[in-house]
């Protein structure tokens, strides 16, 4: 019986080592070069109405030309992507209202979180929206909800080769 304890301990340590190494998998650490597919948090995941949820993580997203950014939307947010050259200070923010709706230079606009879900969608507040970036450039991404943008909910997608 005394021989079983060290044997079981050794098996447990080996199993834990295999489990930990499989969790790491392939981390694709290639020195920060852009990838073809990137996943981004759009909303901090708190699903609250406060500024703590008004984040896009990371703030600068790197993707290869012809790549896709998958925005994991958490909460009441709407993605607006602008053509290269548009800056946060260029956004025409109305003095009041729920949404900004600046269509000048708009490249992509996501699902509206307001009202009932569109046909075929079960939930427009917690979802994944994938955006294809066919050309190089620095694209501005904002939350189209006025107060969220004013709280700093924007980021950039840098498309490179």
Predicted features and spans:
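Bacterial N-terminal signal peptides that target proteins for export
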Residues: 1-9
């Amino acid at each position: 019986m005394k021989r079983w304890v060290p044997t079981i301990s050794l098996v447990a340590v080996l199993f834990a080592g295999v489990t930990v190494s499989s969790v790491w998998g392939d981390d694709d650490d290639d020195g920060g070069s852009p990838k073809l597919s990137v996943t981004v948090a759009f909303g901090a995941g708190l699903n609250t109405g406060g500024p703590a949820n008004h984040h896009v993580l990371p703030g600068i997203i790197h993707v290869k030309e012809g790549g896709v950014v998958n925005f994991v939307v958490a909460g009441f947010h709407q993605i607006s992507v602008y053509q290269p050259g548009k800056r946060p200070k260029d956004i025409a923010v109305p003095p009041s209202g729920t949404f900004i709706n600046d269509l000048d230079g708009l490249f992509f606009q996501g699902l509206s979180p307001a009202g009932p879900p569109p046909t075929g969608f079960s939930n427009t507040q917690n979802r994944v929206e994938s955006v294809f970036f066919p050309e190089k450039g620095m694209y501005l991404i904002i939350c189209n909800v006025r107060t969220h943008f004013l709280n700093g909910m924007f980021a950039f997608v840098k498309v490179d080769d």
